[in-house]
A protein has these predicted regions:
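Mid-chain, well-packed structural core segment of small domains
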Residues: 68-92
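Amphipathic alpha-helical binding modules
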Residues: 89-133
Length: 133
């Protein structure tokens, strides 16, 4: 029970930090804040920024607690999704693809329904369509 409360508090804290980052207008400020969020909530930006989806899934598989793993995957998907707005092609599509794959995994394996997640997945499909792997 304590662990579940901790994970929920961590997610709320992450979402609040993400909201504050989105308020920033300057792209460089947003990128720097995104790097900080990676390092604070998910793991090293140096790894996750260049990792393939296969590498990400392997890294996440190392987290034994399923609820914690799904929460981290959801946070990482949010970071990829938001970071895509700060970069150009082809990096944008790569980030959106990784975000979609993570959202899809969380949707399939998690027990929390999220209309927001589904809307983001639909938006990603619209943006990159056939480029989804």
């Amino acid at each position: 029970m304590l662990q579940r409360d901790y994970i929920q508090r961590l997610i709320r804290e992450f979402m609040a930090a993400l909201e504050r980052m989105l308020e920033k207008k300057e792209v460089e400020e947003r990128r720097e804040k995104i790097r900080e969020l990676y390092n604070q909530y998910v793991g090293p930006y140096a790894f996750y920024s260049i990792a393939t989806i296969e590498d990400v899934m392997k890294a996440m598989a190392g987290i034994a607690d399923e609820e914690k793993r799904l929460s981290k995957m959801d946070m990482l998907a949010e970071l990829y999704y938001n970071e895509a707005d700060t970069v150009g092609q082809p990096t944008r599509d790569e980030l959106l693809n990784k975000a979609f794959m993570l959202f899809d995994y969380v949707e399939a394996h998690g027990d929390t329904f999220s209309i927001e997640r589904r809307n983001k997945m639909a938006e990603i499909k619209q943006k990159i369509g056939d480029a989804l792997k």
